[in-house]
Amino acid sequence: MNSIDILKEISNSNNGLIQTKTALEQGVSRASLSKLCKDGKISRISMGQYVLSEELHDEMLSLQLRSNLIIFSHESALFLNKISERTPFEHAVTIPSSKTLSRSISSECKIYYIKDDLHELGKTQLPTTMGSLVWTYDMERTICDIIRSRNRIADETFLSSIKQYASSSHKNLA
């Protein structure tokens, strides 16, 4: 089996994402990855992550795999919880206030900080539009975050999300 076939198998089993670590474990060398990238067979989306050229990649999954601290929140969580129909231009993530993210991740998303002991509160897994499961906050935590950070959120997003949540039959008021 040649390198591209191995990478197709990896891609199929990992929601379209090929990580260098996984490719190396399967016998594909870094030189092969570089050559396939130059030949246009695969595309590098970030350090250590590739996709097959003909496929779209899941940005949220890519971000999540680059840091285990990331939990999608605010506008991104509104979208994942189906409170908002609008895809956010920039993904919003929350991390513990005692931690930092790499510059490459920080440049791609809006970062919110929270006390370490509150970081895991309301954490759940939901599917992205591409079907990958990512960590995000549940509806109730998301609404609390939106209210807490309303000065950093567009007025239209704030008001529509509160109205949408209030009219939702899935809210948990207990």
Predicted region positions:
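Nucleic-acid-binding surface
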Residues: I4-I6, G16-T22, C37, Q49-A174
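N-terminal amphipathic/basic helix or basic patch
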Residues: N2-I6, V28-A31
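Basic, Lys/Arg-rich alpha-helical nucleic-acid-recognition elements, primarily the DNA-binding modules
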Residues: D5-N14, I42
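Short amphipathic alpha-helical interaction segments
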Residues: E25-K38
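A short, conserved structural fragment
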Residues: G40-M47
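Residue-level marker of alpha-helix boundaries and capping positions
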Residues: I10, A23-L24
